[in-house]
UniProtKB/Swiss-Prot annotation:
InterPro entries listed in its UniProt record: Cytotoxin_Cobra, Snake_3FTx, Snake_toxin-like_sf, Snake_toxin_con_site, Toxin_cobra-type
Keywords recorded for this protein, A-Z: Cardiotoxin, Disulfide bond, G-protein coupled receptor impairing toxin, Secreted, Signal, Toxin
Family named by the database record: Belongs to the three-finger toxin family. Short-chain subfamily. Aminergic toxin sub-subfamily.
Gene3D superfamilies, per database record: CD59
One example GO MF annotation: toxin activity
Miscellaneous note of the record: Negative results: does not affect blood coagulation and does not show significant hemolytic activity.
Disulfide bridge map: C24-C43, C36-C61, C65-C76, C77-C82
Name of this chain's protein: Beta-cardiotoxin CTX14
Expression sites (tissue/organ): Expressed by the venom gland.
Keyword hit for Transferase: no
Taxon lineage: Eukaryota, Metazoa, Chordata, Craniata, Vertebrata
CDD domains registered for this protein in UniProt: TFP_snake_toxin
């Protein structure tokens, strides 16, 4: 009986979201996700225009969505892995 109870507790802990787990991309290419720190509950993708046909892309976690400008397009979202 104790084994069954312990198994149920372990399964419950594994299945429940017990902490902060927002996941966002953290590299220019959409390959590697990272868990955001506490307080940063949005994913951000910033596309920066460097030359007429060249762009840099920055992805990561943020607490406040920055504003877009003429040379920087900012897209924020608040679900896991949404900054592709």
């Amino acid at each position: 009986m104790k084994t069954l109870l312990l198994t149920l507790v372990v399964v419950t802990i594994v299945c429940l979201d017990l902490g902060y787990t927002r996941k966002c991309l953290n590299t220019p290419l959409p390959l590697i996700y990272t868990t955001c720190p506490i307080g940063q509950d949005k994913c951000v993708k910033m596309t920066i225009k460097k030359l007429p046909s060249k762009y840099d892309v920055i992805r990561g976690c943020t607490d406040i969505c920055p504003k877009s400008s003429a040379d920087v397009v900012v897209v924020c979202c608040d679900t896991n892995k949404c900054d592709k």
